[in-house]
Amino acid sequence: MLDVNNFEYMNIGLASPDKIRSWSFGEVKKPETINYRTLKPEKDGLFCERIFGPTKDWECHCGKYKRVRYKGVVCDRCGVEVTRAKVRRERMGHIELAAPVSHIWYFKGIPSRMGLVLDMSPRALEEVIYFASYVVTDPANTPLEKKQLLSEKEYRAYLDKYGNKFQASMGAEAIHKLLQDIDLVKEVDMLKEELKTSQGQRRTRAIKRLEVLEAFRNSGNKPSWMILDVLPVIPPELRPMVQLDGGRFATSDLNDLYRRVINRNNRLKRLLDLGAPSIIVQNEKRMLQEAVDALIDNGRRGRPVTGPGNRPLKSLSHMLKGKQGRFRQNLLGKRVDYSGRSVIVVGPHLKMYQCGLPKEMALELFKPFVMKELVEKGLAHNIKSAKRKIERVQPEVWDVLESVIKEHPVLLNRAPTLHRLGIQAFEPTLVEGRAIRLHPLVCTAYNADFDGDQMAVHVPLSAEAQAEARILMLAAQNILNPKDGKPVVTPSQDMVLGNYYLTLERAGAVGEGMVFKNTDEALLAYQNGYVHLHTRVAVAANSLKNVTFTEEQRSKLLITTVGKLVFNEILPESFPYMNEPTKSNIEEKTPDRFFLEKGADVKAVIAQQPINAPFKKGILGKIIAEIFKRFHITETSKMLDRMKNLGFKYSTKAGITVGVSDIVVLDDKQEILEEAQSKVDNVMKQFRRGLITEEERYERVISIWSAAKDVIQGKLMKSLDELNPIYMMSDSGARGNASNFTQLAGMRGLMANPAGRIIELPIKSSFREGLTVLEYFISTHGARKGLADTALKTADSGYLTRRLVDVAQDVIIRETDCGTDRGILAKPLKEGTETIERLEERLIGRFARKQVKHPETGEVLVNENELIDEDKALEIVEAGIEEVWIRSAFTCNTPHGVCKRCYGRNLATGSDVEVGEAVGIIAAQSIGEPGTQLTMRTFHTGGVAGDDITQGLPRIQELFEARNPKGQATITEIDGTVVEINEVRDKQQEIVVQGAVETRSYTAPYNSRLKVAEGDKITRGQVLTEGSIDPKELLKVTDLTTVQEYLLHEVQKVYRMQGVEIGDKHVEVMVRQMLRKVRVIDAGDTDVLPGTLLDIHQFTEANKKVLLEGNRPATGRPVLLGITKASLETDSFLSAASFQETTRVLTDAAIKGKRDELLGLKENVIIGKLVPAGTGMMKYRKVKPVSNVQPTDDMVPVE
């Protein structure tokens, strides 16, 4: 057997007839499959045992030889070799065709490869191959031309005229003869000459032909192999036939298609032997051609062959194509053993790294381990009795199971797995019942809730797999989100609410101003009802041993609340005492204003101090991030568990519920509504008098009602008591927001109709008062649209992720430093005056390209190639520096991937990225996963041109697919000055730009908004009108860097507007993949063809080679490809074929004799090899473990 891990590369090519015969173990002569009485395969049929091997292990067809001792014997009676039955999965047969037939992929594909080689149109080819016309194969010395088509009538006339001097024939035989006559070298030389002189259409045709002919010449494939003399028959186990319960047979469609070919082939042989008239033979040959076409790609030409019930049969091509094809169904996504699935329920008692596995599930999953352990412990004599013990579920089995699962992590996965946190490892604990218990804090990462979600469990078997699961995938390790480096395991809902309630402060609460010696004393007072959790009290600062106070602070009294004392118990040692929700308190120390000299009047001081806000969800997140930064993983995960327990405990104790009485009705509501109504009446009056247009009237009415709702919302929030449960829920960040509250207690406001236009009649009632029938009806539109949008969005977002993963799957950190001297200039990302992304956010975790100095003192803040961390980034910003040169994936020189320096910090771990990290896939997941949070809508602002800007998911797709954007902006192609702006006819305006050399004029629609005025100085690529730039246009007039930065800026803009943060480096990796190709304009003295697409790396290598010999290099221009196009243009044919357009990719690859170097992840998964990322990289595979223990002297037994 081939060892899959020793593959270097994989080749694909055309098979010669001899090659096909060498694969075969015998010729299939009969269309029979299985004998209906004996149920044994028929001899020489499609399932023949003599050709394909025995159906039963070690047993020949006639039964003369049985048992393994006859291994390798060929039976003298039935001719079957005695061997394993699984050879029926790998042995092929063949059919000798009575007449050559063409391969439909090469004749029918676009462009037709056969047509390009022969320089004939596909139309002409079709006429010849399907016996409609003759083609002249050898004109001899007649006036006919080679490859000329003749109809039946013309052929007869020429035969009468010239006799047998010339040769013309029809069918694939004729094409075969023409293909054999082609001299590749001569043709290529002629075409190269033609290229030098020709223009336009002829030139493009020549380039296309040259590409195909060069491919044949270089790959060693012969053009005549596109015509088949012999047809391979795939192994029978890959097209099985099985008996169903009713005695009927279920069979693969391929068997039907093969049977048609064999029947027609045998009939043709018989007709040829009988010497039948040519018209009958021709008809039979055409039918054979059609049968082979249907077998290879049914439905590609003419009507597809159908089976019972008019269903088209699945041909060989269909077996590979699409989601259900071989690539995506069986090679890239396999079903695995040692897995289970069940409903999840919450496990609040679990530790961060644990999950609860139902007992019976665990027993089934760990069965082999339990059996081994039972035998080792002597509780069973052999494996068989151990198995019996497990099946009978004897009591000792449970004890053994307990010890087996200890420290054996399992993987939990929730579909849809949108990012890498959708699969994490946990240590199992056994639980009763049949549901999996999940830790509440990992729900955010899985996007799981407990309303019936299910999860799958997988068991890592080998020691290496277990080690990887424990070290890399354990839930306690995955605290940061790979997309932005922020903690993903922040408490939510009840936990937030509990901690919020615990840290509330109230003026004048029971026992305010009491002084305590230490925390225990304060808690005792609380338990006995002398103080409340929210009471502000004083505690001796020196009693809080684990907290960092300054020496001065230690000697004083600390003003805090009882709840905050409890909250601070969960924080790690030497962390500042959290007394107010501010950045300085988290990062530096507790502010001095909370400390009193001993003996001061505590009550009086407390009475004067303002109330501090409680700790909301955001603050909890910041505390976690700071703890992670200081104390790393282990301490953070322990602290998270403590925070979770505290939150649950106090949200239970607080007993926060929602009742109708909590929804306070606003008294002023009626007045506000009446005032708004009178404003609307005014507007209507103006409209009726003709003072304003319909459009203006609509706009004003909408804005009046929006303003009224805002006023109500503002007043409502002010009128709420801060202990109102609904207010607490929304303020703490547990659930809900101000808008929900306004709808409950104020008014519902304006709604949109099904078309998305806002209805100008607002819903004046709130849910508390109840809606009228009309109002209820209007509300239903929005609800329905919301549900439909969500469903569509999920599918769109998933498909976007799939394309992103595909284009970047081979981007891996391949080396430490690529040695580039280029970088990008990082500035804050701005949209107008608003900053989308601050400079420090762009700098953190990146390597500096150039030294950064303080502009005033000249002090070096960061050296070249030094990592910029949070502190350094802050120093740079505080020094007033506005732009910094940093290393970037855009400018990295590593051929297939990125280097450590250009990538920077790994956001998921907060430390340097390792060589072998699959950063491309992480980037794709980071961009795709928030896709579902983006909106679907295109904003329409009442038909103002240039304002219908696409946003949300459609805009992201538009950018990554490099499509022409909606509402496209006009850009200038020259540097210069705007000299005039004129109105021209047809509602257009003309902008005239005068440059140093030439003057250009641009027209824009009359109502589009201009971004320039007369007299403005402008540079190439600058926008003249509002809207989105077409990046392809931008690439034509500016350089690569401008386009890269534009795409980065636009993608970040969409996500940040929706409140989603994504690290720049992820977008950079994707944009880099879109700009990897160069279109060759002039080949110079290199071997590349003009007009071809080449990888930047291959292009520079080819030029380097030519320059070293002192010749002329090729010139090219960078090309921007959309992600789908870029995926299909990848060097790996396996990756491209498994993505989309499978047959086109494979046709092309076979002709070129492509070689897949197996550099990406997909290719290796397909052939079943370890992926070249992480520990699968060759660098790590070659590491040999060496014992570092010194050998000791021989042990001496102690007497």
From Swiss-Prot:
E.C. code: 2.7.7.6
Transmembrane segments annotated in the record for this chain: none
GO biological-process terms attached to the record: DNA-templated transcription; response to antibiotic
GO molecular function: DNA binding; DNA-directed RNA polymerase activity; magnesium ion binding; zinc ion binding
Function recorded in the entry: DNA-dependent RNA polymerase catalyzes the transcription of DNA into RNA using the four ribonucleoside triphosphates as substrates.
Family of this protein: Belongs to the RNA polymerase beta' chain family.
Protein name per UniProt: DNA-directed RNA polymerase subunit beta'
Taxonomic lineage from the root: Bacteria, Bacillati, Bacillota, Bacilli, Bacillales
Gene designation per UniProt: rpoC
